[in-house]
Amino acid sequence: MENRFEISMLIDYYGTLLTEKQFNVMTLYYNEDLSLAEIAEINKTSRQAIYDLIKRCSKQLHSYDEKLKLSKKVDKRYRIKEELMAELNKNSNLDENIKKYIDEKLEEIINA
């Protein structure tokens, strides 16, 4: 299977665009680390059906990301945040509480 972390992130971004069953299976497989057999048993279906569903959903999530580019936008925001924080840390005159406050607010912007 593909990079588990990458798919897990795509589930976080686009999971609401999947059906309830697709979302549940993808979450069980990528976030809860259940095996195909365990998921098949829970869903009362075959291991092959779960495997096919996971492959289909992975392609679907990648397709959403190619079109909407949320992961690239978030990555870019984190890079900008790190650059800003590096510049702030160069200035030793700033109070640590102010730096922490700015860091928290930048995090809110990224996650908005």
UniProtKB/Swiss-Prot annotation:
<dbReference type="InterPro" id="IPR054831">
    <property type="entry name" value="UPF0122_fam_protein"/>
</dbReference>
<dbReference type="InterPro" id="IPR007394">
    <property type="entry name" value="UPF0122"/>
</dbReference>
<dbReference type="Pfam" id="PF04297">
    <property type="entry name" value="UPF0122"/>
</dbReference>
<protein>
    <recommendedName>
        <fullName>UPF0122 protein CPE1714</fullName>
    </recommendedName>
</protein>
<comment type="function">
    <text>Might take part in the signal recognition particle (SRP) pathway. This is inferred from the conservation of its genetic proximity to ftsY/ffh. May be a regulatory protein.</text>
</comment>
<dbReference type="InterPro" id="IPR013324">
    <property type="entry name" value="RNA_pol_sigma_r3/r4-like"/>
</dbReference>
<dbReference type="InterPro" id="IPR036388">
    <property type="entry name" value="WH-like_DNA-bd_sf"/>
</dbReference>
<comment type="similarity">
    <text>Belongs to the UPF0122 family.</text>
</comment>
